[in-house]
């Protein structure tokens, strides 16, 4: 059925309802008929017609007597379902007498509007007034509001209260009770409640499992699932979907395969929702080809399944494949939704493809998802990671609603672009709006302090503000402090901090300190740190490379040879440097000394041209990092054809003069390329942005935004 047909049917229904509303204000209309009309208006959100009926009841004096409670309850139901909670409460407060339906309708109204605290407050008023005895519907609403607001202690008190009234025997009360315990406690309390219940069916176990899944208590969720197996329950569709979701989060492929086999055996694998759960599970378990097979075998293609398979490729870091799937979609038959756009924009962000991101932004605007928070967050992320922090700011400013993810994305984006002060200003604005920072927020803030050398302020955020906002520091926060201190040249403080910190350091922390030693030329400490890190993490290639670079900078060629020999003996492979640039909606990828590109001869000629132009400006090849066992000329050639230089050269050939270039590299940009590209930006009068594994480098007129520290 087309959208136009739906609208036409809705208008016909509206006209029919409107014709039934009494026109005479003096003649009472049959009450039963009016109540039926109010019910239809409430369920269809026809507020204006409902208001007309309310007006008729007032003028015919049918809404102020105690015996008219049924009509008033119908009106309360209308207003709460039309999100007019304040008007519903006015009616409720003016009622001469209230019954349990009145209380329950008002509670549900508050709950549907997200005011769970008001629900619990209203229940307490009902309980202490003694006007009405709670029933199973009231108990369900109360337990649900405890779940929504995380008020487990109050929930336990209400549990005792409803036990006294004998309401726990009702199936849906039991289900919401168990869900509350599993969601809010996150421990074995729900299982203990299950054991204490006189009767449990599959729906109760499903509620417990759903709660544990929501709060991330996957071990307890697995215990519940085992109980369902021990009780010999016949699983239904919900059980299978929940179990797949559980195994997705546990990344337990073996158990997931057993469930998939069982689904096939009992015919539960053909439903669209089940196929989506299977695709999601295989994607999370790193088996994207299995996910593709499930997708290919599904006959009912829709946006839910298309988005799920794209997400599977996104989880697998196969970002280009996710984008290719979208290009094959018939967007007229299967229009993208907010989840589709979020996955696509985040895939583009990981690939740093600004032009493609701009095109997709246009489609977002056409599709009407401009004001959706999830899409807005993805747009900010895409522009920030694609090198245009200015467009990220515009996307951020244009958002009608923002959440913690929005602020975190903006703070992190500014930080990675080296705009530390702007990141800290965004943090201050976030606090001013009342948003509560989380662990991700403080990672961005501490990195920002590190980029601009705000040591004291960074330590204040770490020691004071994180405690104030009840954020427990983890390994990433501690590593940020190591970077903050060592980048400022405070190596003694960094060593003391690492020695006394109450955590076990990982290889990233040691690499952070080692990189600072390399950049700050503290080679003595660098060698000491590298030797310790190699002993503890013998398979991490990054540590070997940094140690080799330290030896090379010191002209200790024997040390370089020793490190490379050690890597060969241990089978440790250096991650190859790869750079890419987007030209006319196509991505061009380059390796060092690449000879695979169809225009490589032209590219090499351009490299030679620009290198000859920058030498008179003071460029001197940094041959320390090149192979020492070849002659000087060969070393210079090796450096000339690094992947980032090839990408920049291709951009200079293929883009209009004075247009900006955006290049991405998978590892840290080398010292020689950094020096060269600074001067290339000067002679070409180009704005060149390079994103490496550490940060963004904005090259303009012979300078870089990183101030030669990265």
Swiss-Prot record:
Q: What is this protein called?
A: Pentatricopeptide repeat-containing protein At5g39680
Residues found modified as N-acetylserine? 2
Q: Which UniProt keywords apply?
A: Acetylation, Repeat
> Segment Type E(+) motif: which positions?
585-615
Q: Where is this region: Type E motif?
A: 509-584
Q: Which domain of life is it from?
A: Eukaryota
| One Gene Ontology term from the biological process aspect of the record | RNA modification
Q: Where is this region: Type DYW motif?
A: 616-710
Q: Where are the PPR repeats?
A: 35-64, 68-98, 99-133, 135-169, 170-200, 201-235, 236-270, 271-301, 302-336, 337-371, 372-402, 403-437, 438-473, 474-504
* UniProt gene name: EMB2744
Q: Which family does it belong to?
A: Belongs to the PPR family. PCMP-H subfamily.
Kindly indicate whether the keyword Repeat belongs to this entry: yes
- The residues forming a coiled coil are none
One function term, GO molecular function aspect = zinc ion binding
InterPro entries named in the record: DYW_dom, E_motif, Pentatricopeptide_rpt, PPR_At4g14850-like_plant, TPR-like_helical_dom_sf
Extract the NCBIfam families matched here.
Answer: PPR
